[in-house]
Amino acid sequence: MEDKRIVLAIILSLVVFLGWHSFAEYMGWISPKVQHVANERHSSVDQTATSNIALDSVQSVFSPPTGKDVYIETPLYIAKIHSSGGILSSFILKKYKVNLDNTSPLVNLVSPEASQAMPLGITLNGQPSWSNGNWSFLGGDLYLKPGETKELTFVGIVNGVKIIRIFTFNADSYLIHEKLQLASEKQNSCPTKVGLLVAATPFGTGQYDPTRMAWSIKDSFKEETSIDTLKEKGIQESGEFNWGGVMSNYFMNVVALSDPLYLTIKGRIQNDVWRVALERSNVLIPAEGTTSITVNWWFGPKDRELLSRAPDKLENAIDFGMFSIIAKPLLTALTFFYEYTGNWGVAIIVLTLCIKIVFWPLSQKSYNSMEQMKKLQPMMQKLREKYANDRDTLNREIMQLYKTYKVNPAGGCLPILLQIPVFIGLYQALLNSIELRHATFIYYLPFTHLVWLADLSAADPFYITPLLMGASMFLQQKLTPASGDPTQQKIMMVMPIIFTVMFLNFPAGLVIYWLFNNLLSIGQQWWMLRKA
């Protein structure tokens, strides 16, 4: 019985880990996050609204500056930058669609609404540079072929400070490198506070892919996902930052400064636009001299390979949580299997099989231990009846029973306990992998023209795999040696129902993993029963 209690505690803990957020939203304890992809939004933003970019000193109007648009096209994206201040007007990803429809538009990480918050913009002492000065640019539209890098320079005069923004674009990366030069025409040195802005409308797609504000401070990942908090209070924190911005599981708009510097991050949601600023205070511009700041911007997917080559710890933006040490090798293995199978769903099944093989000896030990515990149940029941009013003696007698028959009461649950971090690691790996976005397993439901498992990052639209998963759990429960406690038996039989309901809206890739893991476990249990 003690063995079953431990197993039950582990399972309930896993249920809480996976299902708490959904339950809390359903009960109304936290507000639901209504997310949309940027291209699907049709809300309007008041162009004369006062900026609440979280740069408290900025109280200027975010109105479109005069000037012209400059286009930059690479094999990866098409960007549009406004010549007045170097403001980003749109950033369209050429390799990613909003949805699976053939007519779907491409993902635009800077929607028309977000562009009103002036992403890629800079402020000096809280004043917007794009509307308080005269700007010109050197060059024209840029078209980059693979392997090429090209530059674009914007020059402005704002309140006696000459701003030179030299952007370098790489055809093979989403990174935009900027050399920001500030030159003073004054006779004395000028301490200046410089703000760097990013903005986005929500490009997350729901509960398992929320849009959030995130930042890296002293190489540690931090984030804020609460819409209520970001609307009412916003965020503000100072420290040695690597980068900060807006992101979902798959995409991000962030700004970074080379080398960790003491900065302040501020962010807020206003009119459904997520605005983040990194502020660097006391930037000293020497008298009649120039100071330079190295800035890196990333507007694009959270691609592990590309981010691993990016500066400023940008690879930390892919956060796998406390089980990253497990999630990363699992994702590497999954990618390896995909290269040979050409199908992410098949790759998940192969990975599941490999994990099952690794844990086969432990699972076998678990089943043996539970079978031994089952044989002891009649003797344990007699002890409970004999010492019903003497719990201390009962516990001593039960422990002596374990010792006599050489049974470890935890032997059945420890192997399960060891597998839970693997499941959570894989959960995080699948949830944060851009490779699985719109990855197909079985496009059409067999014998129909209904789109089925066309996107492993989305839920099964017909709930077929969650129902099969629940049925497999029920069958597995039937094959597992039962506890002598009727109450525990009833609870364990209810678990498949709980998991089925919980998995209805899980990404299909995770459900497939759990389903095939159950099927392999059933096969192992059947083999052991035949062997016995």
Swiss-Prot record:
It is a multi-pass membrane protein. GO terms for cellular component: plasma membrane. Gene3D superfamilies: 2.70.98.90. It is found in: Cell membrane. It holds the Pfam family 60KD_IMP. InterPro entries: Membr_insert_YidC (IPR019998), Membr_insert_YidC_N (IPR028053), YidC/ALB3/OXA1/COX18 (IPR001708), YidC/Oxa/ALB_C (IPR028055), YidC_ALB_C (IPR047196), YidC_periplasmic_sf (IPR038221). One of its GO terms (biological process) is protein transport. One of its GO terms (molecular function) is membrane insertase activity. Required for the insertion and/or proper folding and/or complex formation of integral membrane proteins into the membrane. Involved in integration of membrane proteins that insert both dependently and independently of the Sec translocase complex, as well as at least some lipoproteins. Aids folding of multispanning membrane proteins. PANTHER family: CYTOCHROME C OXIDASE ASSEMBLY PROTEIN COX18, MITOCHONDRIAL, OXA1. HAMAP family: YidC_type1 (MF_01810). Belongs to the OXA1/ALB3/YidC family. Type 1 subfamily. This is Membrane protein insertase YidC. It comes from Lawsonia intracellularis (strain PHE/MN1-00). The gene is yidC.
